[in-house]
Amino acid sequence: MKEITNDMLAQLRASYDADGQAQVLHSALAKTDMAELAYVPGAGARLKGAFSVEVKTRGITAQQKSGRCWLFAALNILREKVAETCHLDQFELSQNYLSFYDKLEKANNFLEMVIENAQEPIKGQLMQYVLRGMTDGGYWSEAVDLIEKYGVVPKQVQPETYQSNHTDRFVVAMNRLLRKDAMELRELVQAGKDPYPRKAVMMAEVYKAACIAFGQPVQSFDFAYRDKENNYHEERDLTPQAFYQKYVGLSLRDYVAVINEPTADKPLDTPIQFHAVENMAGRDMKALNLSQAALEDLCVKQLKHGQAIWFACDAGAFGARKEGIWDPASVQYEALLGGFSTDMPKGKRLEYNSSSATHAMLLTGVHFDKDGQPDRWKIENSWGKDVGDQGYFVCSEAYFKEFVYEAVIDRRHFSPEQLALLEKEPVVINAWDEDY
């Protein structure tokens, strides 16, 4: 391997000293936030305006300083059904209620994987994946599992706490506890002893800690509200499951996660099964890998049908948070830092860890150009009303093609050929083989 030499440094210095533009850029960056300078107002302005197709939604939510975007997006789809059923202008489901059970399920899954793989080497790829511990993050299928098992409740029944809005310290504390528990469980299994009496005690500790941080989940509640005509309604002693069945009633298994991840290990037109990615023990995440054009076509169909779309993208790529825009032409960090290029094919970008799905939101609209093709997309974010257009964002078609990786589609919009693909044998990918 070659190290940096004095000759090399001299050449680098001479190259920079001869570049007057680079020195001007340094002067600007020395005193100004890079995000302010990277944004190109003229390019961003072309993304403003109404949308050809737009789905009405009931306002912006705020996940605060937590990583629960995936759950907010899922519940924001469900709340539209409640609002329609009850004739409400505004409504929100409790994110805290399901977040509690998400943490509990992730802790249980962690301990079960430790027990199941107790003979695996501690420094092996599998155990190092397990020992990453829990996070706030998740996917559509994890939200579905939680909703089907635990139901949902209105936000006023289990409101946010400071800890549910600021989860970092709780997650750090739980991971320290779980890693200590992992050490003990591995030692018990390796000594030929039953680990489950100790696991029960460990789960009780996690449950108590989660109750202290987030509040103990309700088992039943009364639902009282006034509809848009000011008529009073009340139903007593509802369980979260009964509330879901009566006021939401969606068959969530009719929705399919469609991904566009054109990597060497994920063939297109093929179901992909991500082993051990789920929050619940023994569950795998499944998705159908389609071309970008097919994914986009399904999104347009669903929006035209009046249905918002849960989707996942790389929120760190070409984003202007304050302006509420994702667009390579509008956010030019490369030009600001000397004019280099980060262009890579979409599949290679994933393979080289240059990009991944980091944020989930809702697609709620699309605008078509003069040829009838999408050129910008409306997004309902969960970052509150102080950013974007009162909390709504927009992304360009260029961004959508390169940095949108997943969309959840009602199977009614699939072609017969696409439905048949769901019956194919899936390609199985272990979570520890990729960055999940």
Language-model-derived ranges and their functions:
Residues 2-58:
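N-terminal regions that are enriched for targeting/export leaders
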Residues 44-309, 380, 387-390, 397, ...:
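Active-site nucleophile-adjacent alpha helix/oxyanion-hole segment immediately C-terminal to the catalytic cysteine
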Residues 76, 316-318, 366-368, 384, ...:
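Short, glycine-/Ser/Thr-/acidic-enriched flexible segments
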Residues 282-358:
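Long, positively charged binding patches that form subdomain-scale interaction surfaces
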Residues 369-436:
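Conserved catalytic-core surface of thiol
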